[in-house]
């Protein structure tokens, strides 16, 4: 078996993801898929970067086919969990196993910078993506 070639890029060279729809929970987010199957041939890994301006959010969602980690590099807001919302701030490191609800809401007046990744999938399509059915809301924790 021949190993794949290493991949290298720079954040400023990776375009913002287009086509992420608000009706699917992507609210005013600036998302970059830095490493994945589409550019690095990584079939089981995605690494990304997201900027959430004030008021932006990634609504509660889940991935049935991958685990996710999230590092809050700067800013603060609230994370969504299976049971509600919790405060989050710079330095938080969050692990969400596949099949669990999660998301992030920038409730502050400054940008939030997130570094995140998926293990077990090389693309959004492979990760799977589900949002709650209308009216399926959780109780606040």
Segments and roles (model prediction):
Residues 1-44, 59, 129-141:
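A short, N-terminal "cap"/entry segment at the start of jelly-roll beta-barrel domains
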Residues 31-33, 47-51, 69, 85, ...:
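Conserved hydrophobic/aromatic beta-strand scaffold that supports enzyme active sites
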Residues 39-40, 65, 109-110:
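Short strand-connecting beta-turns/loops that link adjacent beta-strands
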Residues 36, 74, 119:
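Cofactor-binding loop segments of dinucleotide-utilizing enzymes, especially the Rossmann-like FAD-
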Residues 57, 63-90, 100:
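A short beta-strand-loop-beta hairpin characteristic of the jelly-roll/cupin
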Residues 78, 85, 89-90, 98-124:
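Ligand-binding loop in jelly-roll beta-barrel domains
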Residues 45-47, 57, 76, 113:
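Intrinsic-disorder/low-complexity, polar/charged segments enriched in Ser/Thr/Lys/Arg/Asp/Glu/Gln
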């Amino acid at each position: 078996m021949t190993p794949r070639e290493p991949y290298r890029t720079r954040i400023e060279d990776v375009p913002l993801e287009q086509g992420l729809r608000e009706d699917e929970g992507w609210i005013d987010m600036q998302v970059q898929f830095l490493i994945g199957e589409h550019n690095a041939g990584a079939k089981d890994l995605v690494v990304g970067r997201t900027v959430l301006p004030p008021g932006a959010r990634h609504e509660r969602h889940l991935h049935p086919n991958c685990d996710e980690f999230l590092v809050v590099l700067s800013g603060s807001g609230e994370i969504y969990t299976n049971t509600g919302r919790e405060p989050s701030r710079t330095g938080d490191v969050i692990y969400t196993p596949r099949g669990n609800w999660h998301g992030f809401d920038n409730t502050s007046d400054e940008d939030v910078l997130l570094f995140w990744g998926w293990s077990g999938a090389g693309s959004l399509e492979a990760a799977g993506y589900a949002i709650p059915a209308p009216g399926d809301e959780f109780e606040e924790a």
